[in-house]
Amino acid sequence: MSQPWPAAEIARVILDGFDDYREHFRRITLGARERFEQARWQDIQRAAAARINLYEEKVAEVNGWLRKGFEGQVLLDVEQWPLVKNAYIRLIDPRLDDELSETWYNSLFCSLFSHDQISDGCMFIHTTRPSMRVHERAAQTRTYALTDRLKGLLRAIFADYAFDVPYGDLEADLSRLEEQLRECLPDWVCKDPQLKIELFTPVLYRNKGAYLVGRLYTPDEQWPLVIPLLHREGHGIEADALITDEAEVSIIFSFTRSYFMVDVPVPGEFVNFLKRILPGKHIAELYTSIGFYKHGKSEFYRALINHLANSDDRFVMAPGVRGMVMSVFTLPGFNTVFKIIKDRFSPSKTVDRATVIEKYRLVKSVDRVGRMADTQEFADFRFPQGKFDPECLAELLEVAPSTVSLEGDTVLIRHCWTERRMTPLNLYLEHASEGQVLEALEDYGLAIKQLAAANIFPGDMLLKNFGVTRHGRVVFYDYDEISFLTEVNFRHIPPPRYPEDEMSGEPWYSIGPHDVFPEEFPPFLFADIGQRRLFSRLHGELYDADYWKGLQEAIRAGKVIDVFPYRRKSR
């Protein structure tokens, strides 16, 4: 008599693996408070990278458990996997993180089977979870009412959010925050006896900062609220700002930032809380912002297929200069670009496909300091041919036939990255006012400086490789030539040996593979003479090799820079 197919046993192994992953994820996350209190800034960076890498490491580990525990012909009988899915659903129904466990199951399925075997019967292409569930548990938020003065309300907050390191000068902080609050909100709000503040109970940590996140509200209106805290070594903890502007808070949760460390027993409830105060953010971005980037990827994919099913949108080539390494296309009604690697690169490019993939994956694990767009990597996208503009599809088939192909009336994209769509900086400057040009070039230089101080050298710093977000921030998004700043050899151009050297079309000095000459930047970056002069006035030190060498020395000495995710006026 044949043995029953072990659907329940396979489902249990997958969920046990998820529990193991979540325990390790939580352990790293819970260490964030101690690292902040002890000012262990380099440990913070290492922990962030370790937590990102943890997911794939644990998927590989559980894949090994499954292959060891079940015979191949049993485990890999895909026709039986709807039984595994049903057994798994029964296991996760009582959980508080059940939406994440669906994504985990999908990752294990994809690690075992080729993508052409993906179906909603075998895995969770569409979620089986309700959008909002009510669980019996302790509240994840604290609420503070205005009883007398604003300062008293703020004092009550900081009494609840104490650390092992004391606040350096809490009275001064309270006075400053009260003043900022009065500047941010209408006078009637500050005097409204029904004014309340609701804060998420766990503190959010990222880089050198800790963040209290919540909202201010009256019966009629609400505003987001973020209070960033800094640990000034030797001077205690300081409340650095009070931010109520939705655009400013949105930037703090931007796709250009590293992921927060925050302990959230019920992730979906916290994401819904964030969604209420940041209605312009997609839930995919909010899940990603707190470290659940794989589930963010799931939510992104669901939003994409829903958009395609419910619109007449078609893929078109993205605006801007065609890439030398990547081909980029987009959906006009969906705020994302899709990037594929070309089969052949422009002759001036010395990288290969494997190097490009390595560079793009590197971006996931480094501190993006608000200046590099996050990416999601996908394999085996399948779309109806009718969803492509014919010229777009023809170009993709021409430049990347090993990646893009037609299977009947289906377009198969074997490998691609997605990024948030932005306006290319070169196109933005073409139509910008004088004031907008000044602001954009100021921010462009700051982006380069902040990336460099975080040990990232963009390599190709042309304007076309940077974009402008809806909030007006300049962000780098083309990663095929990035490297660690400490790997670059910055040099001054040697003086000419003879007068004839300056007239020669060839350099009179040797150039190594990692050599960079900042004096060559001005004509390389700017064809427009006016923009070149303006940028030289704003950020002329970028043309000096000694400036870059100074940054390298600071990085090698272990210095971790301060890059604030809120504008100076908020501080």
Swiss-Prot record:
Q: Where in the cell is it found?
A: Cytoplasm
Keywords from the UniProt entry = ATP-binding, Cytoplasm, Glyoxylate bypass, Hydrolase, Kinase, Nucleotide-binding, Protein phosphatase, Serine/threonine-protein kinase, Transferase, Tricarboxylic acid cycle
Q: What is its EC number?
A: 2.7.11.5, 3.1.3.-
Q: Name one GO cellular component term.
A: cytoplasm
Q: Which GO MF terms does the UniProt record name?
A: [isocitrate dehydrogenase (NADP+)] kinase activity; AMP binding; ATP binding; phosphoprotein phosphatase activity; protein serine/threonine kinase activity
Where, in this chain's numbering, is ATP bound? 318-324, 339
Q: What residues sit in the active site?
A: 374
Task: Please tell me whether the keyword Cytoplasm is annotated for this protein.
Answer: yes
Q: What Pfam families does UniProt report for this protein, alphabetically?
A: AceK_kinase, AceK_regulatory
The protein's annotated catalytic reaction(s) are: L-seryl-[isocitrate dehydrogenase] + ATP = O-phospho-L-seryl-[isocitrate dehydrogenase] + ADP + H(+)
Q: Which GO terms describe its biological process?
A: glucose metabolic process; glyoxylate cycle; tricarboxylic acid cycle
Per the annotation, which location comes first and is thus the protein's main one? cytoplasm
Identify the HAMAP family for this entry: AceK
* Family statement: Belongs to the AceK family.
Q: NCBIfam families from the entry?
A: PRK02946.1 (NF002804)
Name the job this protein performs: Bifunctional enzyme which can phosphorylate or dephosphorylate isocitrate dehydrogenase (IDH) on a specific serine residue. This is a regulatory mechanism which enables bacteria to bypass the Krebs cycle via the glyoxylate shunt in response to the source of carbon. When bacteria are grown on glucose, IDH is fully active and unphosphorylated, but when grown on acetate or ethanol, the activity of IDH declines drastically concomitant with its phosphorylation.
Name the UniProt record assigns to this protein: Isocitrate dehydrogenase kinase/phosphatase
Query: Which organism encodes this protein?
Result: Pseudomonas entomophila (strain L48)
